[in-house]
């Protein structure tokens, strides 16, 4: 019976939906996290009577036809890139991007990844790194005798050194933009890789046209909204239960048919 396969596809779709929602909820407090949504598409249709064909009885044109759908499939899981709320911190190396852009990160493999999680620190050599020790690109080193660190909205990094009244420039933070942010590949650790779908990265200083600005002493909070996610979770759960009910009903119909035949 087609209803069994159709309902099974609905249950599989809602299972994926719940998995996406649960990942959003799990990352409510993850710096720079962007929530995701699952989108679905209908499957092929069985055409019993084609619209516009002639009826076999009197030759009239069939106005709508008869088509029965075969279920649902996952079309995509897309990322919602709206801005998260800037959260004040006490670290001078914490950065939030206000607007579009990603900060380039050098991976141990030599690849360049990209992130919006600006909760940075320094390693034992004074280089600015992520929580996992990956270098921010281009590389910037904070001198050991630095007494104050200032990062401007345009990404200029300056430090004050012992015995020197004037600040010294030690680097310039850049941002990367992509034609299709949805095409970036998430690899965990708040990092993304460029793909053929995202297009090549375009680099520029923060504040340039089309690029966001930096906020020092801030990090960007996750854009997950708890109320919206719980509402979506309840909706997905109800849809799953209804598809399960369809399977139960179809099974009862099959049993009744079998009993009639026997």
Swiss-Prot record:
Biological process per Gene Ontology, one example term: bacterial-type flagellum-dependent swarming motility
Keywords carried by this UniProt record: Bacterial flagellum
Keyword Translocase (UniProt): no
One Pfam family, short name: Flg_bb_rod
Cell compartments where the protein resides: Bacterial flagellum basal body
Subunit annotation: The basal body constitutes a major portion of the flagellar organelle and consists of four rings (L,P,S, and M) mounted on a central rod. The rod consists of about 26 subunits of FlgG in the distal portion, and FlgB, FlgC and FlgF are thought to build up the proximal portion of the rod with about 6 subunits each.
The protein's name: Flagellar basal-body rod protein FlgG
Lineage: Bacteria, Pseudomonadati, Pseudomonadota, Alphaproteobacteria, Caulobacterales
């Amino acid at each position: 019976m087609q209803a069994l396969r159709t309902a099974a596809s609905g249950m599989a779709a809602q299972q994926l939906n719940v998995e996406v929602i649960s990942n959003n909820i799990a990352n409510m407090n993850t710096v720079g996290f962007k929530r995701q949504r699952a989108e679905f598409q209908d499957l092929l249709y069985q055409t019993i009577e084609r619209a516009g064909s002639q009826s076999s009885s009197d030759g009239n044109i069939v106005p709508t036809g008869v088509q029965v759908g075969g279920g649902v499939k996952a079309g995509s899981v897309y990322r919602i890139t709206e801005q998260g709320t800037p959260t004040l911190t006490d670290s001078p190396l914490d950065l939030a991007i206000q607007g579009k852009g990603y900060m380039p990160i050098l991976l141990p493999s030599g690849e360049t990844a990209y992130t919006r999680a600006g909760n940075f620190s320094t390693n034992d050599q004074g280089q600015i790194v992520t929580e996992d020790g990956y270098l921010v690109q281009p590389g910037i080193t904070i001198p050991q005798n630095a007494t104050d660190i200032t990062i401007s909205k345009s990404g200029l990094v300056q430090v004050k050194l012992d015995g020197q009244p004037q600040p010294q420039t030690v680097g310039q933070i850049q941002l990367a933009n992509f034609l299709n942010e949805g095409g970036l590949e998430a690899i965990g650790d708040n990092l993304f890789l460029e793909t053929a779908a995202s297009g090549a990265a375009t680099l520029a200083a923060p504040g340039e046209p089309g690029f966001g600005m930096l906020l020092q002493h801030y990090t960007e909070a996750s854009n997950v909204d708890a109320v919206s996610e719980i509402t979506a979770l309840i909706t997905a759960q109800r849809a799953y239960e209804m598809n399960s009910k369809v399977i139960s009903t179809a099974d009862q119909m099959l049993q009744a048919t079998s009993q009639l035949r026997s």
